[in-house]
């Protein structure tokens, strides 16, 4: 037997289910749709290999060839950028976009504009140690960070994805502070 209470309960359940569907639909959506912003994609695709190179440079500093101050900074750079690489790969996955392993290698000029070291420069750095390594590493990391700041600023100007904008904001803030620290080490 259907009572007023049963009808009211069913109506309330239907409203809750409908509301949940609307909320979930708004949260999900088609992540592969054309709504993905090209500035966001360009930033993420470019920043992954950019960060990977900074991590490689940090690994060189952590293998015993660098002074204590450089090693400490290299640890912080690696600790900050490894999780950002993971996060950016997650963003690409959410969008249904493959990682572009050659994003920073379209031309040597493009890579240089973004502060990337060439393979020859990385090899040269790997052959150094002591004060010579420290000085070259600092100079290279300043250039590298300046490129990352430019990339982050471009993402902040043209991007729309909230997660991408948060990463770009963090990169800009952290790397500007690290540039100041690197310059102090270079001049100190």
Q: Where are these predicted regions, by residue range?
A:
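C-terminal motif of bacterial Sec signal peptides marking the signal peptidase cleavage site
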Residues: 23-26
């Amino acid at each position: 037997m259907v009572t007023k209470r049963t009808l009211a309960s069913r109506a309330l359940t239907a409203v809750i289910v409908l509301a949940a569907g609307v909320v979930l639909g708004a949260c999900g959506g088609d992540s592969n749709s054309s709504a993905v912003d090209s500035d966001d994609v360009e930033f993420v695709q470019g920043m992954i290999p950019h960060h990977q190179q900074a991590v490689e440079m940090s690994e060189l500093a952590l293998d015993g060839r660098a002074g204590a101050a450089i090693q400490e900074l290299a640890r912080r750079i690696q600790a900050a950028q490894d999780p950002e690489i993971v996060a950016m790969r997650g963003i690409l996955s959410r969008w249904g976009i493959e990682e572009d392993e050659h994003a920073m290698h379209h031309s040597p000029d493009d890579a240089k504009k973004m502060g990337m070291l060439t393979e020859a420069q990385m090899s040269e750095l790997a052959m150094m140690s002591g004060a010579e390594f420290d000085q070259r590493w600092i100079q290279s990391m300043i250039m590298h960070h300046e490129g990352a700041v430019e990339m982050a600023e471009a993402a902040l100007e043209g991007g729309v994805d909230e997660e991408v904008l948060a990463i770009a904001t963090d990169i800009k803030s952290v790397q500007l502070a690290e540039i100041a620290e690197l310059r102090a080490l270079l001049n100190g």
